[in-house]
Amino acid sequence: MKTAKRLISITGMRDILQRRIPVMSLDSTSPGPLVWLTACIHGDEVGGTAIVHDVFAALRATALLRGAVHAFPLINSMGFENVSRFINTDREDLNRCFPGDAHGSMGEQIARRLFDTITKSQPDLVIDIHNDWVRSVPYALVEPGAEHSSQEIHQQVLRMARSTNLLLVEDSDVLHSLHNTLAGALINAGIPAFTIEAGGAFAIVEESVLAGRDAVLAVLQCLDMIEYPKARNTHNGAAVPLKYTNQPLCTSSGLIRFEVSPGEAIKRKQALARVYSAFGSCEETLRATAPGYVLGLEDHARVLPGRQVIAIAELP
């Protein structure tokens, strides 16, 4: 088994500032699938980096039986240094810049370099690891299949995402253009990819890191790349993905107090949270629009009209 660590350049500003990001590789030297792991595409989502570290540590301890695993453990070095989701002062979201443009904005240039590096290696699967709100549960997030890929690729993605044993959720094109996310752009290029949302950002939460590590190892086991004990994640075994929604949104401003917890099953019209004025009067009650599970809750108590304050996986 061969291991390697290297740095690749991601910007073309050689005369001013050259940025490089780390790449980790582990090769069994036996034929098999190639899996890429990507993490910290948003600079404040450091838990994903820890998950990559722990996955590689586990693989070195248990041995990779076949194939290879490559990883970008810390993509957004600029955001990481500034504890920011974005890559620069223009507040570019790197995960809305794919597949990128070699002559575009800084975000588009970085995205192009990353995208080309991954696609040229012809991987069998890419797992993009993110972190959500501080109060959130880990889940596997897949792109809507009908619009972005062939049925064959979509079924591969579902099979791999389901093998994580995490809550399985389908993203929504209504919220943003999924064509410009890393996973969406890869699927459009014919490469199976999905996202793992593993707990809160900003800090490394060991419980979330463990869940994320086990989810990735469960996928590798499904691909017959390792022999690993059954994963501890057993949240959802639904054959059909649940639907991601950011509803209900706030229509008033004030202080929000939640009446549900991440991971909790909810019913239609159930009270999820109430918004209070500075005098303590209830200005608004937010209710579930459909049955499902709570994925995460807003980090801040202050809310404004039109703001997303909760993430829910609705039952189909």
Question: At which residue positions do the language-model features occur?
Answer:
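Structured catalytic-domain cores with a bias toward divalent-metal coordination
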Residues: M1-P316
